[in-house]
Amino acid sequence: MDVVEVAGSWWAQEREDIIMKYEKGHRAGLPEDKGPKPFRSYNNNVDHLGIVHETELPPLTAREAKQIRREISRKSKWVDMLGDWEKYKSSRKLIDRAYKGMPMNIRGPMWSVLLNIEEMKLKNPGRYQIMKEKGKRSSEHIQRIDRDVSGTLRKHIFFRDRYGTKQRELLHILLAYEEYNPEVGYCRDLSHIAALFLLYLPEEDAFWALVQLLASERHSLQGFHSPNGGTVQGLQDQQEHVVATSQPKTMGHQDKKDLCGQCSPLGCLIRILIDGISLGLTLRLWDVYLVEGEQALMPITRIAFKVQQKRLTKTSRCGPWARFCNRFVDTWARDEDTVLKHLRASMKKLTRKKGDVPPPAKPEQGSSASRPVPASRGGKTLCKGDRQAPPGPPARFPRPIWSASPPRAPRSSTPCPGGAVREDTYPVGTQGVPSPALAQGGPQGSWRFLQWNSMPRLPTDLDVEGPWFRHYDFRQSCWVRAISQEDQLAPCWQAEHPAERVRSAFAAPSTDSDQGTPFRARDEQQCAPTSGPCLCGLHLESSQFPPGF
């Protein structure tokens, strides 16, 4: 038996063991896998959303009691809308009531109608069961799914027990979707989205809700989880235009401090809508998003900029990503009704100015072929040691998304020993990123370039073993090879030896020791201190960069 057969049998046995644990139930796991110890009685420790608290809850306040009475009174109005859906599905009254709040016992039926789940079930009878069984037999990422399921909504009473009923349903949904949509496959965010659906929908309905959320043109979430990335880039360009128009001082400071693009709120928008705020506000924002569609993304972004305008103007280059994410979360640490009130006002203002949705995507933006990365204001190469090219002339909005021919990076000066300075022009690599290795004739494996399209853990242009990994975990894989002294002195040496530079340009590239590493083994590696900055946190001190950055 060769190595391939041994590895295949080992993966099959591992997959069967995981499936068997979920089939046995919450008593099947090991002691360390059981999670938090469940309470014997949940009578006084569970709030109205299902969150289990460590201590007994205090009595209801007058404000909470008033909110409960208001929700009960609104239930009859929502029932009337569901009874005459054709009349209200495109009405202003539906939008107004969505911002005021959707009753919890109406949320499940309303989500089902908004996502057209019943029609999908009628068109695909038995499809979910087929995909689920196929995923159990052939899923290549069941270990990652199992790990993410174990950490999803563990404070909720539905998902508190390890290998419990809801965790088993969540595993089945993610396995089935991995087989149903191979282009997206599995991403970590999908476990949180599917868990929210499972709070109010049955298992099969939650699966089709996930399918509709990513596939429907109204919501366009697949752009955040596919290699095409059209949704991400369109929203990124629109966000830069809207913020520059409404808050010019804020955007000017962002440009000056090189914080635009990579540190935009779109970078953590989906993450915050899932796992960054209280469950009550999360559900209300998802209600608005399901009713409004893609138009709700820009108002949420605009509110974060407007509320945090004073803090953003004080944000420095040191650790910008971590600071911005924390302040974006702090935006929602307030009353839910106040947040929705500001969101509605922002939605109306952007609609009047026609800035609530990005311009239509270019034809190339939806293609699956490898594409050059569009130039954005303040866009920087994120690898440690890369020289920063001087900014070009400001572009008008809307800017062209793709170029007709591969561009060339602007010139940058290279300091040499003795005070000499030489101008370099780096040709753009296959992924649209300026590649010093190609210009210098050095080994291509000595540099790793990662172009970040504003969304964490979703790299679309990774120049290692293919253009894109659909299951790539950004936080565990964002390491960069340290730059050796030979790499730093290579430009100066090649300037003095032009013949060697030409000869080395046609030489076969040397292999990188990391390129042969299996994907799963590399995914488990942590960011070493000597391997450069971790791109997911972007804690980049100014002293870590060369003078030309």
Curated annotation (Swiss-Prot):
It is a lipid-anchor. It comes from the Eukaryota. A lipid is attached at C318, C325 (S-palmitoyl cysteine). Ubiquitinated by a CUL7-based E3 ligase, which leads to proteasomal degradation. Palmitoylation is required for membrane localization and protects TBC1D3 from ubiquitination. Residues 350-425 are annotated as: Disordered. Gene3D superfamilies: putative rabgap domain of human tbc1 domain family member 14 like domains, Ypt/Rab-GAP domain of gyp1p, domain 1, Ypt/Rab-GAP domain of gyp1p, domain 3. GO terms for cellular component: plasma membrane. InterPro entries: Rab-GAP-TBC_dom, Rab-GAP_TBC_sf, Rab_GAP_TBC_domain. It is found in: Cell membrane. PROSITE patterns: TBC_RABGAP. Keywords: Cell membrane, GTPase activation, Lipoprotein, Membrane, Palmitate, Ubl conjugation. Residues 101-293 form the Rab-GAP TBC domain. One of its GO terms (molecular function) is GTPase activator activity. Acts as a GTPase activating protein for RAB5. Does not act on RAB4 or RAB11. TBC1D3 is encoded by a collection of very similar paralogs with multiple copies of each paralog, some human genomes encoding well over 50 copies depending on ethnic origin of the donor. PANTHER family: RAB GTPASE-ACTIVATING PROTEIN 1-LIKE, RAB-GAP TBC DOMAIN-CONTAINING PROTEIN. This is TBC1 domain family member 3F. It comes from Homo sapiens.
